């Protein structure tokens, strides 16, 4: 799972969970076929479709020099009916 950074929890991503769609941020250089292969191999699910878009990096200033944070890519992964990805929440004891 080198390409997938983390799953995103926003209002939209929670709404998409009802449609069996999962949202995650991935590395910019990863391709759709790589991400699809990793998701199917790691979670044992079947992927129907994948949508992606690039999110812009935020501007950061250090004195007179203006820089920016890294750009990253967000993938919306649609699974076949009957498949799901278990929650990745660590239980506190």
Curated annotation (Swiss-Prot):
**What name does this protein carry?**
Large ribosomal subunit protein uL23cz/uL23cy
Q: Where in the cell is it found?
A: Plastid, Chloroplast
Q: How does it assemble?
A: Part of the 50S ribosomal subunit.
Q: According to its record, what are the GO cellular component terms?
A: chloroplast; ribonucleoprotein complex; ribosome
Which coarse location class applies to the principal site listed for this UniProt protein? Answer: plastid
Which UniProt keywords are given for this protein, alphabetically ordered? Chloroplast, Plastid, Ribonucleoprotein, Ribosomal protein, RNA-binding, rRNA-binding
Q: Which InterPro entries match?
A: Nucleotide-bd_a/b_plait_sf (IPR012677), Ribosomal_uL23-like (IPR013025), Ribosomal_uL23/eL15/eS24_sf (IPR012678), Ribosomal_uL23_CS (IPR001014)
Q: Which family does it belong to?
A: Belongs to the universal ribosomal protein uL23 family.
**Where would you find the membrane-spanning parts of this chain?**
none
Q: Which PANTHER family match?
A: 60S RIBOSOMAL PROTEIN L23A (PTHR11620)
Task: Quote the Pfam families the UniProt record gives.
Answer: Ribosomal_L23
Q: Which GO terms describe its molecular function?
A: mRNA binding; rRNA binding; structural constituent of ribosome
């Amino acid at each position: 799972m080198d390409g997938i950074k983390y799953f995103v929890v926003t209002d939209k991503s929670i709404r998409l969970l009802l449609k069996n769609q999962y949202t995650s941020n991935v590395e910019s250089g990863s391709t759709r076929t790589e991400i699809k292969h990793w998701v199917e191999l790691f979670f044992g699910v079947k992927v129907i479709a994948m949508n992606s878009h690039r999110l812009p990096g935020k501007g950061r200033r250090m004195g007179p020099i203006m820089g920016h944070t890294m750009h990253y890519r967000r993938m919306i992964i649609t699974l076949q009916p009957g498949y799901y990805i278990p929650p990745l929440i660590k239980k506190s004891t």
